[in-house]
Amino acid sequence: MAANYSSTSTRREHVKVKTSSQPGFLERLSETSGGMFVGLMAFLLSFYLIFTNEGRALKTATSLAEGLSLVVSPDSIHSVAPENEGRLVHIIGALRTSKLLSDPNYGVHLPAVKLRRHVEMYQWVETEESREYTEDGQVKKETRYSYNTEWRSEIINSKNFDREIGHKNPSAMAVESFMATAPFVQIGRFFLSSGLIDKVDNFKSLSLSKLEDPHVDIIRRGDFFYHSENPKYPEVGDLRVSFSYAGLSGDDPDLGPAHVVTVIARQRGDQLVPFSTKSGDTLLLLHHGDFSAEEVFHRELRSNSMKTWGLRAAGWMAMFMGLNLMTRILYTLVDWFPVFRDLVNIGLKAFAFCVATSLTLLTVAAGWLFYRPLWALLIAGLALVPILVARTRVPAKKLE
């Protein structure tokens, strides 16, 4: 098991309290006006996000359907078939590189597509917690600043701390993170293009148990190299280095068998390059493992569906928040009356929910209109339901 040492230093903290007068009606109205502008921007941005997402989703789905109808699987990956020149091919095989990747500073050498060195520094980290409360007619903001030491991969600028004295971090690391990538990667006789090499991202931690300490001032503990006098009790500024790799090339007695991938791309000589579809999209697919062509396209369609629904939800949320901010001024006008204020708040949120849902569905329908007119009309009909429900509830409330 890898050792993961940490400091036993005492947590430090201090509290600051800022006092300000309670904002008047005009001041709060001015703040709300600024929020209205932000809300308007979010509202308009949501239309762009939802509409373009539908175009992207349908374009991707069309390209995948086209690719599935055209893809062919060569008889062998150890020979280049001339009859497949320019065609979309389905290749399965183990990755192979031309040379070892290494970091001579730490004595690390292995056959892989990518080798990543990850460097962390022991630093002071500031966290703050704030709360506001009213006391004697004044608004008070209490902020609690806490300082603790942690291993972080990014430089934390202690000059931005509320209290830098006693919590100063170094301004740079003596050793930096980096990633080495094999220039040539093959599957059988075929060379992967740079776009496919970028997709090899199945990083695994590299065990350092069989490596020796590379230098006198570097200590190996578990799967880390420590630039520290005592890794068990590190000091601010100490470093620790770990390694990970992706795309193991060739069988290794310690790391296991070579990594197998499934690629769908265009054959250009002995290279696998992007394939352009009739819809204007490109197909350049790499999946980790052994999959049939049908399985690869099914996985891509599922991924496209999840991305589409995720962006739809993000667009709806942006629209809902935008409407909330734009109607916030109505809440400000009545916030002197507690009971009425709460009723208005509930009503405004219900209004924003209904309008955001309706406009989202209408925007989705508009995005589909050019591709699937019948589906667009159905969604447009569903979009009117929340509005009709809201309108029918208004007379009922008036009768009450």
UniProtKB/Swiss-Prot annotation:
Cellular component terms per the entry's GO annotation: endoplasmic reticulum lumen; endoplasmic reticulum membrane; Golgi apparatus; nuclear inner membrane; plasma membrane
A GO molecular function held by the record: identical protein binding
Membrane topology classification: Multi-pass membrane protein
Subcellular location as annotated: Endoplasmic reticulum membrane; Nucleus inner membrane; Cell membrane
Top-level taxon of origin: Eukaryota
Illness association: Arrhythmogenic right ventricular dysplasia, familial, 5: A congenital heart disease characterized by infiltration of adipose and fibrous tissue into the right ventricle and loss of myocardial cells, resulting in ventricular and supraventricular arrhythmias. Emery-Dreifuss muscular dystrophy 7, autosomal dominant: A form of Emery-Dreifuss muscular dystrophy, a degenerative myopathy characterized by weakness and atrophy of muscle without involvement of the nervous system, early contractures of the elbows, Achilles tendons and spine, and cardiomyopathy associated with cardiac conduction defects.
Perinuclear space side: 53-313, 367-368
Modification sites for N-acetylalanine: A2
Subunit structure and binding partners: Can form oligomers through the transmembrane domains. Interacts with EMD; the interaction retains EMD at the inner nuclear membrane. Interacts with LMNA and LMNB2. Interacts with SUN2. Interacts with RNF26; this interaction is important to modulate innate immune signaling through the cGAS-STING pathway. Interacts with CARD10. Interacts with gap junctions proteins GJB2/Cx26 and GJB4/Cx30.
Annotated transmembrane regions: 32-52, 314-334, 346-366, 369-389
Listed name of the protein: Transmembrane protein 43
GO BP of this protein: innate immune response; lipid metabolic process; nuclear membrane organization
Tissue specificity annotation: Highest expression in placenta. Also found at lower levels in heart, ovary, spleen, small intestine, thymus, prostate and testis.
Entry similarity comment: Belongs to the TMEM43 family.
InterPro entries: TMEM43_fam
Chief location bin: endoplasmic reticulum
Keyword DNA-binding: no
Membrane topology, Nuclear segments: 2-31, 335-345, 390-400
Originating organism: Homo sapiens
Keyword annotations of the record: Acetylation, Cardiomyopathy, Cell membrane, Deafness, Disease variant, Emery-Dreifuss muscular dystrophy, Endoplasmic reticulum, Immunity, Innate immunity, Membrane, Neuropathy, Non-syndromic deafness, Nucleus, Transmembrane, Transmembrane helix
Function of the molecule: May have an important role in maintaining nuclear envelope structure by organizing protein complexes at the inner nuclear membrane. Required for retaining emerin at the inner nuclear membrane. Plays a role in the modulation of innate immune signaling through the cGAS-STING pathway by interacting with RNF26. In addition, functions as a critical signaling component in mediating NF-kappa-B activation by acting downstream of EGFR and upstream of CARD10.
